[in-house]
């Protein structure tokens, strides 16, 4: 499960020459040094916390949880993301140094889950805010699934090129309170338009009473 396709070198050869590229050397050095920023807002985060114990021992993958986004290169989102928390999540992502990666953990993070059907304040997928590298479905995903997602991410890092990193930094997208895409300034440069996430606290009730008044009285009689 933890194997990455890289050539093994002969330890007995004393006068050997190793040739590689700077891109491959950079990828190899980052394989076992992913430092995640834990962003847990719901019950899925409890499953990730089980990896800290001795049974799964996620330290063997080089994962060192960080409390500051400036020291992390991986953010693991677990749980429901609301419109109120969306600016904070985007800002944390912006403060992470390049290259950086995102793992979306759980159904609520990927699609909004059961809260996305009738909730006006739930983001229907964290990929509407930040680019996601690995999707981890489940409600909640098991610790073994988290390990599998990290393994797949490490395999992607091993095949990454410099052009892929530049392309991921040029995406311009964000998500409004009406659950619509907005194409404008890049959300990864600190110029995120906070006004797109503003919603009047009286708007939901106004819509409700407007709908209630439009329904005739005979339709409410059984």
Curated annotation (Swiss-Prot):
Please name the GO terms that the record assigns under molecular function.
4 iron, 4 sulfur cluster binding; iron ion binding; NADH dehydrogenase (ubiquinone) activity; quinone binding
The principal localisation class reads plastid
User: Reaction catalysed?
Assistant: a plastoquinone + NADH + (n+1) H(+)(in) = a plastoquinol + NAD(+) + n H(+)(out); a plastoquinone + NADPH + (n+1) H(+)(in) = a plastoquinol + NADP(+) + n H(+)(out)
Q: What class of enzyme is it?
A: translocase
Provide the E.C. number(s) assigned to this enzyme: 7.1.1.-
The alphabetized UniProt keywords are: 4Fe-4S, Chloroplast, Iron, Iron-sulfur, Membrane, Metal-binding, NAD, NADP, Plastid, Plastoquinone, Quinone, Thylakoid, Translocase, Transport
Note how many cofactor molecules are bound and how.
Binds 1 [4Fe-4S] cluster.
Q: Does the keyword Kinase apply?
A: no
Where would you find this protein in the cell? Plastid, Chloroplast thylakoid membrane
Q: Which GO terms describe its biological process?
A: aerobic respiration; electron transport coupled proton transport; photosynthesis, light reaction
Question: A GO CC term?
Answer: respiratory chain complex I
- Swiss-Prot/TrEMBL cofactor(s): [4Fe-4S] cluster
The membrane topology term of the UniProt record is:
Peripheral membrane protein
Q: Name one Pfam family in it.
A: Oxidored_q6
What does the entry list as the binding residues for [4Fe-4S] cluster? 43-44, 108, 139
**What InterPro entries does UniProt report for this protein, alphabetically?**
NADH_UbQ_OxRdtase-like_20kDa (IPR006137), NADH_UQ_OxRdtase_20Kd_su (IPR006138)
Query: What exactly does this protein do?
Result: NDH shuttles electrons from NAD(P)H:plastoquinone, via FMN and iron-sulfur (Fe-S) centers, to quinones in the photosynthetic chain and possibly in a chloroplast respiratory chain. The immediate electron acceptor for the enzyme in this species is believed to be plastoquinone. Couples the redox reaction to proton translocation, and thus conserves the redox energy in a proton gradient.
Q: Which family does it belong to?
A: Belongs to the complex I 20 kDa subunit family.
The annotated subunit structure for this chain is: NDH is composed of at least 16 different subunits, 5 of which are encoded in the nucleus.
Full protein name: NAD(P)H-quinone oxidoreductase subunit K, chloroplastic
Q: Which organism is it from?
A: Chloranthus spicatus
Task: From the UniProt record, report the name of the gene that encodes this protein.
Answer: ndhK
């Amino acid at each position: 499960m933890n194997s990455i396709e890289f050539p093994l070198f002969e330890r007995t050869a004393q006068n050997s020459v190793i040739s590689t590229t700077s891109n491959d050397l950079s990828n190899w050095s980052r394989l076992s040094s992913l430092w995640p920023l834990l962003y847990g807002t719901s019950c899925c985060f409890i499953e990730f916390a089980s990896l800290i114990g001795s049974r799964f021992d996620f330290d063997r993958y080089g994962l060192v949880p960080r409390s500051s986004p400036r020291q992390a290169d991986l953010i693991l989102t677990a749980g429901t993301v609301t419109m109120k928390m969306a600016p904070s999540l985007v800002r944390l992502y912006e403060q992470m140094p390049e290259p950086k990666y995102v793992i979306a953990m759980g159904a609520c993070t990927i699609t909004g889950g059961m809260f996305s059907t009738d909730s006006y304040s739930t983001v229907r997928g964290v990929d509407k805010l930040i680019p996601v590298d690995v999707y981890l479905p489940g409600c909640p995903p098991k610790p073994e699934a988290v390990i599998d997602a990290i393994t797949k991410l490490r395999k992607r890092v091993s095949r990454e090129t410099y052009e892929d990193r530049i392309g991921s930094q040029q995406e311009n997208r964000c998500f409004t309170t009406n659950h619509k895409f907005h194409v404008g300034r890049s959300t990864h440069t600190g110029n995120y338009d906070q006004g797109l996430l503003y919603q009047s606290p009286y708007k939901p009730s106004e819509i409700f009473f407007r709908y209630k008044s439009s329904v005739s009285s005979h339709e409410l009689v059984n």
